[in-house]
Amino acid sequence: DKKMELKSSNICIETSEYSDYEKTFACCLSSVNLYYFDEWKDDPDFIFDMNILLDCVIEEYIQKGSKLPGLECAVRFAKEHRSIGLGVTAFQTYLQKNNIAFGSIESYQKNHEIFSLLKEQSDKSSRWMAEKWGEPEILKGYGLRNTTRLAQAPKKSTTFIDGGTHLALS
């Protein structure tokens, strides 16, 4: 409803957001490991807190980036959108661990269960943060703090950070 065109590049495929000459897309991403899904799925604070963590990282980026020349467009975007993205890793490992065939009805049901939980808790945390800490200008009236809350998890960079190994097969 704001008539903002989404643009893409070969740099970021995890999520898409608006950008222009005054704003450079910037987001903060993390993943939850589905290998341990059964251990954290009933914790009502786990996903909620992960999104709060990501918003706090965006805030630190804004505060520190505001003092660095050359980051003006990215900081402006971060302030206005507070774009975060929580993704998942190791879905296929979870399926293997639980003897669920990939592509089976059971795997589709598990996929729906997982991502419904992520969406519900991510939206809930963004609404809570908007109420407690305020909505960014672009989201005034929506009751949300973050323009994006979920994202595809970056795999290659995560693997490098993990030291070149990964619980997931991808």
Regions found by a protein language model. Give the residues of each.
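Short, positively charged, Gly/Tyr-enriched micro-motifs
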Residues: S83, G87, Q92-N99, G103
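Short, well-ordered loop/turn elements at secondary-structure boundaries
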Residues: E22-K23, C28, A90, G143-T147, ...
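Internal maturation/activation junctions in enzymes
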Residues: D49-V75, K79, N98-K155
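Flexible, active-site-adjacent loop/turn segments at secondary-structure boundaries
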Residues: C27-V32, R82-I84, I100, T148, ...
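Short, contiguous, pocket-lining structural segments
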Residues: F46, S83-G87, L118
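Function-dense linear segments that define catalytic or interfacial modules
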Residues: D1-A78, V88-L95, T165
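C-terminal catalytic subdomain
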Residues: A153-S170
